Regions:
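Short, flexible helix-loop junctions that flank or precede catalytic/ligand sites
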Residues: 1-236
């Protein structure tokens, strides 16, 4: 269901998690799926460039922020003049970058980016909190209309003692979720994800439970990375 995000034509998709959790790999997989299946103009803005994409069905222009341009804001503004369909933004570091990214998503581009947050509710709070208080209401309304999905991920030590297994949470912006963002009921989002039975909406703890049941991670590892260890312990 995460790869299915490549089917989107517009809006904002965020992949979040701590440093070294594999966010760049997840985004590269989504970009590659678009590149293989659609005729699009894709621009990637990264610091540093981690994955090189060859042209397949799409045209992919890759810019390294440190060597090709002076900042994400400058690079993002320049990229919008080149008629991209898809923009991969390595990181959203400040409110100016976030603001331009949201406007790009609003005007018909698919914008993919990352944040160092864990969980959808924390991510949404973080974006809104970056802005001055006087703008936060307007940003919440804008975010509620442009956000398509938030994927959170972490890498869990595998039972073989060597591998690291990715575990994911996925929030899809349903009408109910959009309403929660708009009405500042963000704390309710985690509960909605937790209780969802939809294939494109699942909690981190559901992922951990499935990985444990498949024998890929230990119970201790699952509980150490859980959002709600007490509840997960009962399920294991």
């Amino acid at each position: 269901s995460i790869i299915n995000l490549s089917e989107l034509n517009k809006g904002l998709v965020l992949v979040t998690g701590p440093a070294g959790s594999g966010k760049s790999t997840t985004l590269a997989c989504i970009i590659d799926a678009i590149n293989r299946t659609k005729e699009k103009h894709i621009i990637t803005l990264e610091d540093p460039l981690e994955f090189l994409h060859r042209h397949k069905k799409s045209i992919v222009s890759q810019r390294e922020i440190s060597s090709d341009t002076e900042s994400y804001v400058v690079a993002l503004r320049a990229s919008l003049r080149q008629s991209p369909d898809v923009i991969l933004l390595g990181e959203m570091r400040d409110f100016e970058t976030i603001s331009i990214a949201m406007t790009a998503a609003e005007t018909g581009h698919l914008v993919l980016s990352t944040l160092h947050t864990q969980g959808a509710a924390n991510t949404i709070d973080r974006i809104i909190d970056v802005f001055p208080p006087s703008q936060q209401r307007q940003i919440a309304v804008q975010l509620s209309s442009v956000l398509q999905a938030v994927v959170s991920q972490q890498l869990i030590p595998g039972t073989d003692g060597e591998s690291l297994i990715p575990a994911f949470e996925m929030m899809t912006a349903t009408p109910a979720i959009r309403n929660m963002i708009r009405e500042n009921k963000i704390p309710q989002i985690d509960g909605t994800i937790y209780s969802s039975a939809a294939p494109n909406m699942f909690s981190m703890d559901t992922s951990l439970q499935k990985l444990y049941q498949a024998g890929k991670i230990s119970a201790d590892a699952a509980l150490a990375h859980a959002s709600n260890p007490e509840m997960l312990k009962r399920k294991l």
